[in-house]
Design a protein with these regions (language model features):
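N-terminal export signals
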Residues: 5-22
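Short, glycine-/small- and polar/acidic-enriched structural segments
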Residues: 22-159, 168, 175-181, 197-198, ...
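Short polybasic/polar patches that bind polyanions
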Residues: 48, 144, 188, 255, ...
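Short, solvent-exposed loop/beta-turn-alpha elements that line the ligand-binding surface or hinge
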Residues: 49, 200-207, 272-278
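Pocket-lining segment of extracytoplasmic ligand-binding domains
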Residues: 82, 161-252
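Secondary-structure end/capping motifs
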Residues: 221-296
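Conserved C-terminal helix/tail region of periplasmic/extracytoplasmic solute-binding proteins
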Residues: 290-318
Length: 318
């Protein structure tokens, strides 16, 4: 993981005697270089005016950020929509859900020259997946709701970064991939892949279209609630700003991910920034993942105790 510190000066707030200065609040935030988190750098920068010391820590996978947050190494993290249910089912009670991040249609990306006109066309195909990833949960839940046996195709498990899935598709090692941005758009732009638009797996009742969540460490939320509220408020403000301007969103995507402007512009036209997930959706996920055998027990009855929507509510009114 990579660490980026943003140190902000603290203006006099008039809360203490003349000449006194408050100690700056500090937050450690885990994130990934993915397009739907484009507001995060600017949100951290905005906290300079509030005197907050923000350390941004980069992770490749949601799962790694989840582990760090549960261990107490992070105050806030971007994680997958399923990660609250996963944590609770495995006995970890240190995560509190705060808000969703964004949504988009999710298409199977087929290799150019292969046929994916309907879900029936996945039969016998080799499809690369990232096992346990947020998009895998979306895909698997969709198959269940459509009554499609998981063994009707050959699942090729690919670990690591999304570039590995694109490489497998480009080399012809698989017929299709189930992945996330920017690794969905890159094959399309480069010509070796296409969106199988009849195979949208973002609309399952169990998982839905949410791309991720912001969560807090439970102890950190109790100890640093004011600072975490300030971060959520800054994030929502930037989310609204970028969501209202595709050009600004595209620029922010490039700044965060290093993507070429062409790729960033395409992605900005696909993703809708803003919270989609709700506690009820997380409950449905928990039930579905238990049925899938992915988590050891159904924790849908525990979700409300580990979700705090009040910070988002306050941020949306700011």
């Amino acid at each position: 993981m990579k660490r980026r510190s943003i140190l902000a000066g603290l203006p006099a707030l008039g809360l203490f005697a003349a000449g006194a200065r408050a100690a700056p609040a500090s937050l450690t935030v885990g994130y990934q270089k993915v397009a739907h988190l484009a507001p995060i750098i600017e949100a951290a920068d905005a906290l300079k005016q509030a005197g907050t010391d923000v350390a941004l820590v980069e992770f490749v996978r949601y799962a790694d950020a989840r582990t760090a947050l549960l261990a107490g190494s992070l105050d806030i993290a971007a994680v997958g929509p399923a990660d609250l249910a996963i944590a609770l089912a495995n006995g970890s009670t240190s995560m509190v859900g705060l808000m969703g991040i964004g949504a988009s249609p999710k298409y199977v990306v087929g290799r150019t020259g292969t046929k994916f006109n309907s879900w029936a066309d996945i039969a016998g195909k080799k499809i690369a997946i990232a096992p346990g990833s947020a998009v895998w949960f979306q895909f698997a839940a969709t198959l269940i709701e459509k009554g499609i046996p998981y063994n009707s195709f050959t699942a090729v498990n690919v670990q690591g970064a999304g570039t590995n899935l694109d490489t497998a598709l480009e080399k012809g090692e698989v017929d299709a991939i189930v992945t996330w941005e920017p690794f969905e758009s890159i094959p399309v732009i480069k010509g070796y892949g296409y969106y199988a638009k009849n195979l949208d797996y973002s609309a399952s009742k169990a998982v839905g279209a949410e791309l991720g969540m912001l969560v807090a460490n439970k102890s950190a939320l109790a100890a640093k609630r004011e600072a975490i509220q300030a971060f959520v408020t800054a994030y929502v403000a930037k989310m609204k700003e970028l969501g209202a301007s595709p050009a600004k969103f595209s620029t922010a995507i490039s700044a965060l991910t290093g993507l070429d402007p062409e790729v960033a512009t395409r992605i900005a036209g696909i993703i809708t920034l803003g919270p989609v997930i709700t506690p009820d959706q997380v409950k449905r996920q928990a039930k579905a993942f238990t049925d899938l055998g992915v988590i050891p027990k159904d924790v849908s009855g525990e979700i409300d105790r580990y979700w705090d929507g009040s910070l988002l509510e306050t941020a949306m009114k700011a």
